[in-house]
A protein has these predicted regions:
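N-terminal glycine/threonine-rich, aromatic-flanked beta-hairpin/loop signature
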Residues: 40-85, 91
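A short, structured loop/turn motif at beta-sheet edges
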Residues: 16-20, 76-84, 107-112, 133
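Short, solvent-exposed aromatic-acidic interface loops
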Residues: 8-13, 33, 64, 89-94, ...
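Conserved small/polar residues in nucleotide/adenosyl-binding loops
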Residues: 1-5
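N-terminal helix-cap/turn-to-beta initiation motif at the start of protein domains
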Residues: 10-27
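An anionic, turn-rich surface loop/hairpin at beta-sheet edges
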Residues: 86-105
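Hydrophilic extracytoplasmic domains
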Residues: 105-134
């Protein structure tokens, strides 16, 4: 999101308005291994959330009971024709990952978002994210 000072009493004005597929807040809800889906309870305190807004993403891993922080990363993203691509601008766990791009195939089924590809470590992954209501 880009903003600019209007230099008057009305404050700030949002100037970007890119709304891409998948925009919103998502909770990691499971993985697919072979043909088996394994879901996790998103009401548990350990969470990974991914926020997608105006062509930018951020993920954060945290614990809602202890307020522990496990990591974060983010940058820009695109989602079109079944391909979700992240361009990493920051990554708290390994700054050597900054500047890389990760591409995934994606499929949205109802409130679920499936994405499949290689992790930032190069390992195969097939994740399931569930849309988080405000």
């Amino acid at each position: 999101m880009c903003i600019r000072d209007r230099s008057d009493s009305s404050g700030w004005e949002k100037i970007s308005g890119v709304t891409l597929p998948l925009q919103g807040k998502w909770l990691m809800s499971g993985r697919v291994r072979g043909k088996t889906e394994r879901r996790r309870d998103t009401n548990q305190p350990r969470k990974t959330m991914k926020i997608l807004v105006d062509g930018y993403f951020q993920w954060i891993a945290f614990n809602t009971n202890t307020f522990s922080f496990m990591g974060t990363g983010g940058g820009s993203y695109t989602a079109e024709n079944g391909i979700y691509k992240e361009n990493i601008d920051y990554f708290s766990r390994d700054n050597k990952k900054v500047g890389i791009s990760l591409s995934f195939s994606y499929l949205k089924k109802g409130r679920d978002w499936y994405h499949k590809g290689l992790s930032s470590k190069g390992d195969p992954m097939h994740e399931i994210w569930v849309f988080r209501n405000p």
